[in-house]
């Protein structure tokens, strides 16, 4: 069994689900336990400046082995797994020499990873896959990234003939709940640029992501006995439905792909008296993003005009921005990663991130950080899987990026 697989199978045993309702940082104790174990492993490998700080960030340095002027590169992955699915007691299954048929994840519960629902499986006939047992997520997002980074660093340590500058690594908590770099010290990390290793299928590289905002809406109704309600009742639930129906139907997640943005109603709770709604608003284009926010404001204004001032309250908050505008000023970071892939026989696929990453926020904090593939598929659920050869290729790509910058200086 290769080292990257060994590490990955060990890491997924740690229960590191993050919790958006927690007020602590990190949000769960399990992440701190995992952080300390990773720090211990990094020390054993011989890295310097290994630290788990008070916020649970793990950082370490592989010192340069040459006097050449070479940029300091960072590699970053996150320790938490998504709260969307249970991440406790993960029991990975290894499917050797995959035959192209449906994979029974859990016979007892009738859970099947089917080729009709997940046609990408057909790309991995003859390969070895790691799947879930159908009761939890797998945790390839992002424990595969952690395993790949550490294995690449170990390779560089064992191959001193590869000249390199300083290489920094960081493992962050709470990425899945949007807090991953809230307390990250970019200045102390002291890199010229970095890569998150948090992407999907083999060969993907991502340097543009959604602009993101949240919209919290509170609707104040007026409850009156329905028998005497004529001309008096104001049903906040129905006003909420009216608001939703005023948004463009085709601009919902289920109707969009590629570079298309959306409004997503993520939560709706209400009574006649009071209703709360929570939206996320996403778009790649800056102007379209601004237009979407203005449009939801105009709907709220129209409803307040119709039902009375103060009926609908809107709290609109920007969350993160498209890192493309930062990365485009430093395209050598993307170009070198693509060169590394091609030299290893991997065709790079530039895809937009229909979401956000730690790298998006880091880019606006002064650390340009595109995202590299881990090799995984179907993150955040029981159908998550990862091909072993893709993990091994991710290790090679990280090593090659470091090597190329060592040569370029």
UniProtKB/Swiss-Prot annotation:
Top-level taxon in the UniProt lineage:
Bacteria
PROSITE patterns from the UniProt entry: ARGE_DAPE_CPG2_1 (PS00758), ARGE_DAPE_CPG2_2 (PS00759)
Reaction(s) catalysed by this chain, per the record, are: Release of the N-terminal residue from a tripeptide
Q: Does the keyword Chloroplast apply?
A: no
Annotated localization: Cytoplasm
List the active-site residues.
80, 175
- Disulfide connectivity for this sequence is none
Q: What does the UniProt cofactor note say?
A: Binds 2 Zn(2+) ions per subunit.
Q: What InterPro entries does this protein's entry cite?
A: ArgE/DapE_CS (IPR001261), Bact_exopeptidase_dim_dom (IPR036264), Peptidase_M20 (IPR002933), Peptidase_M20_dimer (IPR011650), Peptidase_M20B (IPR010161)
Record-listed Zn(2+) 1 binding positions? 78, 141, 198
Q: Which GO terms describe its cellular component?
A: cytosol
Mention one GO biological process in which this protein takes part, according to its record: proteolysis
**Which cofactor names does the annotation list?**
Zn(2+)
The entry lists its GO molecular-function terms as: metallopeptidase activity; tripeptide aminopeptidase activity; zinc ion binding
Question: Which CDD domains does the record match to this protein?
Answer: M20_peptT
Keyword line: Aminopeptidase, Cytoplasm, Hydrolase, Metal-binding, Metalloprotease, Protease, Zinc
Any keyword ATP-binding? Answer: no
What is stated as this protein's family in its record? Belongs to the peptidase M20B family.
Q: What does this protein do?
A: Cleaves the N-terminal amino acid of tripeptides.
**The protein's name in its UniProt record:** Peptidase T
């Amino acid at each position: 069994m290769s080292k990257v697989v060994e590490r990955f199978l060990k890491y997924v045993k740690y229960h590191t689900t993050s919790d958006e309702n927690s007020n602590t940082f990190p949000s769960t104790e399990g992440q701190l336990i995992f952080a300390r174990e990773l720090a211990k492993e990094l020390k054993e490998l011989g890295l310097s400046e290994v630290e788990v700080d008070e916020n649970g960030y793990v950082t370490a340095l592989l010192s340069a082995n040459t006097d050449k002027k070479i940029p300091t590169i960072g590699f970053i992955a996150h320790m938490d797994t998504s709260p969307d699915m249970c991440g406790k007691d993960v029991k990975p299954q290894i499917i050797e020499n995959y035959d192209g048929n449906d994979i029974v994840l859990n016979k007892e519960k009738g859970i099947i990873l089917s080729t009709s629902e997940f046609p990408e499986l057909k790309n991995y006939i003859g390969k070895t896959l790691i799947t879930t047992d159908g009761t939890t997520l797998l945790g390839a997002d992002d424990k595969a990234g952690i395993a790949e980074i550490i294995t690449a660093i170990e390779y560089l340590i064992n191959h001193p003939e590869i000249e390199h500058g300083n290489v920094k690594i960081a493992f962050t908590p709470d990425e899945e709940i949007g807090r991953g770099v809230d307390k990250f010290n970019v200045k102390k990390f002291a890199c010229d640029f970095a890569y998150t290793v948090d992407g999907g299928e083999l060969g993907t590289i991502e340097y543009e992501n959604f602009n993101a905002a949240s919209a919290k809406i509170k609707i104040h109704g007026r409850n009156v006995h329905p028998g005497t309600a004529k001309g008096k009742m104001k049903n906040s639930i129905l006003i909420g439905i009216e608001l939703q129906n005023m948004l463009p139907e085709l601009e919902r997640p289920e109707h969009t792909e590629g570079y298309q943005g959306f409004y997503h109603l993520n939560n709706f709770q209400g009574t006649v008296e009071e209703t709360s709604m929570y939206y996320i608003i996403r778009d790649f284009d800056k102007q379209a993003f601004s237009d979407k926010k203005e449009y939801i404001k105009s709907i709220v204004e129209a409803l307040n005009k119709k039902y009375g001032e103060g009926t609908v309250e809107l709290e609109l908050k920007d969350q993160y921005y498209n890192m493309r505008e930062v990365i485009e000023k430093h395209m050598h970071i993307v170009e070198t990663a693509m060169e590394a892939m091609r030299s290893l026989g991997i065709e790079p696929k530039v895809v937009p991130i229909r979401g956000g990453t730690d790298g998006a926020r880091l880019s606006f904090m002064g650390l340009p950080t595109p995202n590299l593939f881990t090799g995984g598929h179907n993150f955040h659920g029981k159908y998550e899987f990862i091909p072993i050869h893709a993990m091994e290729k991710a290790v090679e790509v990280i090593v090659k990026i470091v090597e190329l910058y060592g040569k370029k200086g």
